[in-house]
Design a protein with these regions (language model features):
Chain A
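An acidic, low-aromatic, low-complexity terminal/linker signal
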Residues: 1-135
Length: 135, 623
């Protein structure tokens, strides 16, 4: 499983997702928090008139030291969301993802330039988030 | 270019759906005895066409069912008529055919049943919504461009910009219109529902539909069908009497239910009226005393039928209908005359895309509430507490008061001193929610929060404001129930000392402006009356004893502020009443006109400052 990957940085760690799954990359800008939404949703973003939720990859992956400035917009059927990342590092091919990982949001990891790059499971991320049932 | 299988299936299903609706209507006509060979042949044609298209794409079951209907109708054509008792089984066959066609999941589409002669294209609804998003955003960018250019150049560019704005408005209107469909897209099932219900009840009822061409937002149409069926059921089961009772009352044996639709101003009114027994005189009397019949019926789940049937009682479910309609920014009206009948009116906005909301801020973020649910705005000065919970006293009634931030569990700073509170009203329930600041009243495009957040309670959607910020539009019924159950809803706000101030009449046609001024003045201890235009104000001036000052806007319908001022000055009794003009007209000519007409003070809205206004008023109204 190879192909062109979009490499992003969150905190000190690197992750990647297939370029074919990325609709666009946008500035994070001012977010509007949605009180009562799940903790991984940091707010909603105005994407040229379309209101989309923004998911904190740092919260999902249990990372710290993140300073999100960009969103990577992804979609699964009707479910569209922006993934908050610190920066987009690179777009290109990665070595084969041969390392096993233990996270529901990653499929595997690849070793690139001496760094471990986690391969994001976009579908798992988008289907895992849903608002809690009314109290 | 070739259409996918799914697209072809969808097309066949839609065409067949139109055929089924016509078949059903024609069968009902035949049953009523009005029909003849014309109807039989029409059914035959439709059955034949469904059979053909189903067979072509390999839907065997549907094709067989259509074929059996075709056989039956061919026999009827040879006999020159259809025995009425065979209509029932044929309707069942049409139902079965519909179910067979529905075997696969459907996709939502716009324009389900176009007028037969106009050329039509079918477009997935999501594409239209996306278009609306982009148009809305283009309008915002255009305004920003206008603003940026306005500071560097004048003249020629502004004409071009104006033209662009007009075109964009037109574009937005036409996209919004693409979201609307005629009511007829949902009425097709009603004659059948009424027929089935009437026969189940052992009654004879005819349904007349008028105004089915009235256009409504497709999202409203999707949700409103159930409410209308509920009202029709109520009318048949509880409104229309048994034939014997009707004849004894001198009415025709067959009851009549009318479904009428039409524009009423910026709304659409859908009425379900019956000529049945109406509600009891006792209930009408109670309604006179307590205010509104619809509230009584909806609140108590009242039923006017003495026996309990498996069908909804007159009032049962009316609360659900009312909540649904109010959630859409509409309203419910009910009129009834004992012995003569009942008429229920659903008032609905033409489009859901555009909604009037009251915008305000809490914790640095903008929020909106549908204007339809906002009763008034007050400034929180004195609070009482009921069972250790803060509340306000409004018109002698205790209303729970909550901090909006606490209700929706938002992080935020403490409320300011004397915060404005919005009084939400629905179904006789009231609650006041306090916020930091009112932003004003605006007509906004309501957008979905997206599939991931769509199921979340508390929000109707979001609106994008002129500065690009997103305002969350809150669900009033969610706030009402939260306010009723939440334990601690607010820290005690700082109270101000009361001082005996005067009585002021605030005149403004804009709700938000009027309520804002009212809240400022009430917080300062004034007694405040309001009027919506000069004419109403002039009447109030004559009525209110001990009025100390009039605070008026200039641009208003009926009678503007200058005319009001002139009329007051010309009045012998009230000629010396202090009048303060609050207006957005800051130009020299307007100021001069105000001074000439005898204004005591002139406050320009852009320079609006609470403290200055209060000082001015205190100086003029001080006793």
């Amino acid at each position: 499983m190879s192909g062109v990957q979009v490499r992003v940085r969150v905190g000190r760690e690197h992750y990647a997702l297939p370029v074919t799954r990325v609709l666009e990359v946008a500035e994070l800008g001012d977010l509007t928090p949605v009180p009562g939404s799940p903790p991984e949703i940091v707010g909603v973003h105005n994407l040229r008139g379309r209101v989309i939720p923004v998911l904190a990859l740092a919260t999902l992956l249990d990372l710290s030291d993140e300073e999100p400035e960009r969103i990577v917009v992804v979609e699964l059927d009707e479910r569209c969301a922006g993934l908050a990342v610190d920066a987009v590092v690179d777009v290109g091919e990665l070595p084969e993802a041969s390392e096993r990982v233990d996270s529901p949001y990653l499929t595997a990891a690849a070793l690139a330039d001496g760094l471990l790059v986690g391969m994001l499971d976009v579908d798992a991320i988008l289907s895992s988030v849903s608002p809690e049932a009314p109290a | 270019m070739s259409a996918s299988d799914e697209e072809i299936h969808e097309l066949v299903r839609q065409e067949a759906g139109d055929c089924l609706q016509r078949m059903e209507a024609n069968l009902l006509t035949l049953e009523s005895g009005d029909g003849g060979v014309g109807e039989i042949e029409a059914i035959l044609r439709d059955a034949h066409s469904v059979k053909g298209s189903s067979a072509m794409i390999g839907w065997g079951e549907a094709a067989n069912l259509a074929s059996s209907i075709e056989d039956r109708m061919e026999a009827a054509r040879e006999q020159g008529g259809l025995p009425p008792d065979s209509v029932g089984p044929l309707l069942h066959a049409v139902d079965a055919l519909g179910q067979a066609l529905d075997g696969e999941p459907k996709r939502e589409t716009v324009a389900k049943s176009p007028p037969p002669d106009a050329p039509t294209i079918r477009v997935p609804a999501a594409k239209v919504d996306r278009m609306l998003d982009v148009v809305g955003e283009t309008v915002l960018y255009h305004r920003r461009l206008e603003h940026a250019l306005g500071t560097v150049s004048g003249g020629g560019a502004s004409e071009e910009l104006d033209m662009g704005e007009q075109l964009l408005d037109e574009l937005q209107d036409s996209v919004i219109q693409m979201r609307t469909l005629p009511l007829s897209t949902i009425t097709a099932a009603f004659p059948r529902a009424v027929r089935d219900l009437a026969s189940q009840e052992g009654k004879e009822v005819e349904l007349a539909i008028d105004g089915a061409e009235t256009q409504l937002d497709r999202v409203i149409l999707d949700g409103i069908s159930e409410a209308i069926v509920h009202l029709l059921r109520n009318a048949v089961a509880h409104g229309i009497e048994e034939a014997g009772e009707r004849e004894a009352a001198g009415k025709p044996a067959a009851g009549r239910v009318e479904l009428r639709a039409g524009r009423r101003g910026r709304m659409v009114a859908i009425q379900v009226a019956d000529d049945g027994r109406g509600v009891s005189p006792e209930l009408l009397e109670r309604a006179d005393e307590e205010g509104s019949l619809v509230e009584i019926l909806a609140e108590t789940g009242f039923s006017t039928a003495e026996r309990v049937t498996d069908v909804a009682g007159r009032g049962v479910g009316l609360d659900a209908v009312k909540r649904h309609v109010e959630g859409l920014g509409g309203g419910l009206e009910l009129r009834s005359e004992a012995g003569r009948g009942t008429e229920v009116t659903l008032l609905l906005p033409i489009t859901l895309a555009l909604m009037k909301v009251l915008l305000f801020e809490r914790g640095g973020h903008p929020f909106g509430l549908p204007m339809a649910s906002v009763g008034r705005v007050v400034a929180v000065a004195g609070t009482t507490s009921l069972g250790n919970r803060p509340s306000l006293e409004l018109d002698g009634e205790v209303v729970p008061l909550s901090d909006l931030g606490r209700l929706i569990e938002a992080a935020g700073e403490p409320l300011p001193r004397n915060p404005p509170a919005i009084v939400i009203e629905s179904l006789g329930r009231r609650a006041a929610v306090a916020c930091d600041e009112l932003l004003g009243e605006e007509e906004v495009v309501i957008k979905s929060l997206g599939a991931i957040l769509a199921g979340m309670p508390g929000y109707l959607g979001a609106a994008i404001l002129g500065d690009g910020r997103i305002a969350l539009v809150l669900d009033p019924s969610f706030l009402l129930s939260k306010a009723a159950t939440a334990a601690t809803t607010m820290d005690r706000p700082a109270e101000t000392e009361e001082h005996a101030a005067g009585r002021v009449l605030v005149v403004d046609d804009q709700f938000a402006a009027r309520e804002l001024q009212r809240s400022i003045l009430e917080a300062a201890g004034y007694r405040v009356d309001v009027a919506r235009d000069g004419r109403e104000a002039l009447r109030r001036v004559g009525e209110i004893v001990e009025l100390d000052l009039v605070l008026t806007d200039v641009q208003m319908p009926e009678m503007d502020g200058f005319e009001l001022l002139e009329a007051i000055r010309a009045d012998e009794e009230h000629g010396s009443l202090p009048v303060v003009i609050v207006t957005s007209l800051g130009d020299e000519a307007s100021r001069k006109r105000g001074a000439e007409a005898g204004a005591d003070a002139y406050v320009v809205k852009e320079e609006f400052d609470q403290q200055t206004l209060l000082e001015t008023i205190e100086r003029l109204a001080g006793r």
